[in-house]
């Protein structure tokens, strides 16, 4: 059971996991683990399934998916019948009023919808993946010089499951640099997998860039692919000013993760998120939601 903290109701909710039985089988049984290592983590598997999700035939899956996971289509720009494929639905745009952005320059917002975990005063060589498993920032981005800038800073992990809005956005106005791409595997980023695969974020395909924000210093943004994520698509223009809330990119089909690293003494994360993170619980958040404030 995966329990997630609801910041509005102050209660814990059980996450309805897409493909839960399959995920548990692939990451918690000997046969499943063997299949994962031989097939599921490979690019060809995710590429093949991603291609299927681009076909018109895959659109037949949409109504059942919406019903089974109670997805609110009232906030989507298109009706179910208007999507040409499952990927078209998966990367759906939302209405302009569904995710309000607080443009107060002191407010630090969530870059997308998902489940958030935050660690502060991070040790660059022992960043927590889950309790008992760690990784280093150097391994994650393969750049020692940039990694050092985030010593004792903050690590924000936003996990997206297949039912979520899968576009990610800029947390402030500023200048995004070029994207750096690192090849890797395609393990699931579900907590079941995170508890089973050491240094999972460093094993998977990922992309990163430095975002020179106007109010929160240089934000290191990392997008991590996952099983069946055919592509990480960057839609922003490098070295051109972006506004707070502007789209940075999106993930095609599959669960996926965005990780932000903040320099020391730039942002104070909200107390409830820090407390739940210490207890091992993710907090459910939406794009544009306040998750911290500027350190003055």
Swiss-Prot record:
Chief place where the protein resides: membrane
Catalytic activity: a 1,2-diacyl-sn-glycero-3-phospho-L-serine + H(+) = a 1,2-diacyl-sn-glycero-3-phosphoethanolamine + CO2
Record site: Cleavage (non-hydrolytic): 255-256
MF term (GO), any: phosphatidylserine decarboxylase activity
Active site: 113, 169, 256
Keywords for this protein: Cell membrane, Decarboxylase, Lipid biosynthesis, Lipid metabolism, Lyase, Membrane, Phospholipid biosynthesis, Phospholipid metabolism, Pyruvate, Zymogen
Subcellular location: Cell membrane
UniProt GO cellular component terms: plasma membrane
Pathway in which this enzyme or protein is active: Phospholipid metabolism; phosphatidylethanolamine biosynthesis; phosphatidylethanolamine from CDP-diacylglycerol: step 2/2
InterPro entries: PS_Dcarbxylase (IPR003817), PSD-B (IPR033177), PSD_type2_pro (IPR033179)
PTM comment, free text: Is synthesized initially as an inactive proenzyme. Formation of the active enzyme involves a self-maturation process in which the active site pyruvoyl group is generated from an internal serine residue via an autocatalytic post-translational modification. Two non-identical subunits are generated from the proenzyme in this reaction, and the pyruvate is formed at the N-terminus of the alpha chain, which is derived from the carboxyl end of the proenzyme.
Catalytic class of the enzyme: lyase
Requisite cofactors: pyruvate
Disulfide bonds: none
Keyword Protein biosynthesis recorded: no
Topological category with respect to the lipid bilayer: Peripheral membrane protein
Stretch forming the signal peptide: none
Note on how the cofactor is bound: Binds 1 pyruvoyl group covalently per subunit.
NCBIfam families, alphabetized: PRK00723.1 (NF001941), PS_decarb (TIGR00163)
Function: Catalyzes the formation of phosphatidylethanolamine (PtdEtn) from phosphatidylserine (PtdSer).
Protein name per Swiss-Prot or TrEMBL: Phosphatidylserine decarboxylase proenzyme
